[in-house]
Amino acid sequence: MKHSDIICTATPSAVPVLPNDKELLRGKCIIAIGSYTPEMREIPDAIWDLTDKVYIELPYACEEAGDLSQPIAEGRLKKEQAVLMSDFLKSDADEDQIAAGTTYFKSVGMALFDICVAQKLLAKSKEKQQ
């Protein structure tokens, strides 16, 4: 994990599967597609020391996914910090910030959004290489 740029989780775990170590998570793109019920959790609290946003597909993710509902209940995350992927796709403002820091994408099953975000990031990457 130390030398990874991207970390993906896809488990039905009830407890975080990543270490609660902000230095291991710093500067990574974290994509969590498991923990689809309020009782499940893949991502540790250390993520909230590194980023103040989470990118989601639909607002109900804040209630449905334990990775979000638990930190909201504990006061670590506010619903306003959850940014819709559709808003991300419409805006160029966050791209440089996303590339420079720790980012957290939480997916709860809308693959179409995942594909659109991946397509936009790939296009931006190709643009920068030219």
For each of these PLM feature ranges, what is it?
Residues 2-3, 26, 50, 100:
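Residue-level preference for short coil/turn positions at secondary-structure junctions
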